[in-house]
């Protein structure tokens, strides 16, 4: 834990997002344009035995769009167990640190989604290496990323904080994805 300005704590994603579990949805407004997307045009038409791993799934903000792909299995994965507990639906929920190896078998998913996640990943090389490991041969990674100049301030339970972020450029993300 560190301070990046007077009386503002800088928290790791797990701690910060667990604190925001009940108020997280009010922070969604700047992301609303993503919620009207249809992912059908990005994935194969034939999706037999289709398995989706939603990385950084949080409270399920992207679940309606991913559920619309009618996967055989959808798995939500996040480091913040309290936020993940808010995720709707009767689905498999896995708490894991995406900076480490993932608790999934090799080539076990057809689609990995990572929306608004990469800014919380320090080691992109490891992130993509692990993503490719659990991805099937013809699998895809669907990434939603936005660039922001400053961290969002959060005030929860009389605690003022920001969540650690790493300002990766699109070029850095592309390079890490290609070299993994």
Segments from the language model and where they lie:
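Short catalytic micro-motifs in class I SAM-dependent methyltransferases
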Residues: 116-117
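Short conserved loop adjoining the S-adenosyl-L-methionine
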Residues: 101-106
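A conserved beta-strand element that flanks and buttresses the S-adenosyl-L-methionine
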Residues: 113
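Short alpha-helix
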Residues: 165-180
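A short glycine-rich, Lys/Arg-flanked "PGG" loop and its adjoining helix->strand segment in the class I
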Residues: 125-137
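Class I SAM-dependent methyltransferase SAM/SAH-binding core
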Residues: 59-100
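Conserved class I S-adenosyl-L-methionine
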Residues: 1-47, 61-65, 83, 142-167
